Amino acid sequence: MLRVAINGFGRIGRSVLRALYESGKRDQIEIVAVNELSQPEGMAHLLQYDSTHGRFLHKVTHDQEYLYIDLPNGSQDRIRIVHQADISLLPWQSLQVDLVLDCTGVYGSKADGERHIDAGAKKVLFSHPGSADLDNTIIYGVNHDTLLPEHRVVSNGSCTTNCIIPVIKAIDDAFGIESGTITTIHSAMNDQPVIDAYHTDLRRTRAASQSIIPVDTKLHKGIERIFPKFSNKFEAISVRVPTVNVTAMDLSVTINTNVKVNDINQTIVNASQCTLHNIVDYTEAPLVSIDFNHDPHSAIVDGSQTRVSNGHLVKMLVWCDNEWGFANRMLDTALVMKK
């Protein structure tokens, strides 16, 4: 059993805990503690009731020291609540923590990870790309086999790299990619205000529900980190749209091989049934973004939107639940780190 602590109980932290119980991995992973500065009442309430993912199937109660999750057999899981702002003072040693899932979005350097380790954890997995000095960055399904026992401070990438990189790999393996561009159409996030308010990014001073808002993205750097051969070959832009969850990615690539739409789509179908099973899914149904809410795949390719121009320019539409899919990959990567 892998003993895991969650640092940061926001959108991703809570999704990871819920996904553990819904994915059938609870017999392999035990959440022993959650570090969160908010009060236990709010932690329990937001775990039980979620505006995006609905009500948690298990009853959640709490006291000042623990969250309690009721199980179907009548027993309870007990999760220690910690309120510690200084990660170097976290009680990971006494709790015998094997792995910290750092879901704060605040920490992400090798030094940050080592502070968790100095506090008693054996390994750390960050929920965002982090700095370039980390031991490894894992996109599960693509390069998780590169994890080594000595890799102690690791990144799980981002929701968008987990979405697009498996698709890029499938197309590149089959046809050879020369270059590409990506537009991320991302749901609103909690760094955007409900009504206009101050922000260092002037576009993000504007009300999230009123506009389509361009934001900076380093997605191309994330691609290069996994595929160094694509250095200076990909560019990306991103916009935030007034929805609460699910992201669409518009991928355009120039490929070496002369192809037709069916060649591209069949490649994705084959990958979804083999090398990228449970990571990439494929559909041609006339679906919209909300239909992919709570989907555990990293990416869902909408084959009805695939286009090919002049045999070499390929455009694809790829969906993901940027919360739930990523949370499930955090758990997958955690189990690989256990080995």
From Swiss-Prot:
Where are the residues marked Activates thiol group during catalysis as a site? H186
The cross-references to Pfam families, in alphabetical order and at most eight, read: Gp_dh_C, Gp_dh_N
State the Gene Ontology BP annotations.
pyridoxal phosphate biosynthetic process; pyridoxine biosynthetic process
Q: What class of enzyme is it?
A: oxidoreductase
One GO cellular component term, please give it.
Answer: cytoplasm
- This protein's major location comes to cytoplasm
Q: What is its subcellular localisation?
A: Cytoplasm
Enumerate the active-site residues: C159
In this chain, substrate is annotated as bound at: S158, C159, T160, R204, T217, K218, R240
The keyword NAD is annotated on this UniProt entry: yes
Q: In which pathway does it act?
A: Cofactor biosynthesis; pyridoxine 5'-phosphate biosynthesis; pyridoxine 5'-phosphate from D-erythrose 4-phosphate: step 1/5
Q: Which UniProt keywords apply?
A: Cytoplasm, NAD, Oxidoreductase, Pyridoxine biosynthesis
UniProt-listed Enzyme Commission number(s): 1.2.1.72
What the record says about family reads: Belongs to the glyceraldehyde-3-phosphate dehydrogenase family. Epd subfamily.
Q: What is this protein called?
A: D-erythrose-4-phosphate dehydrogenase
Q: Which gene encodes it?
A: epd
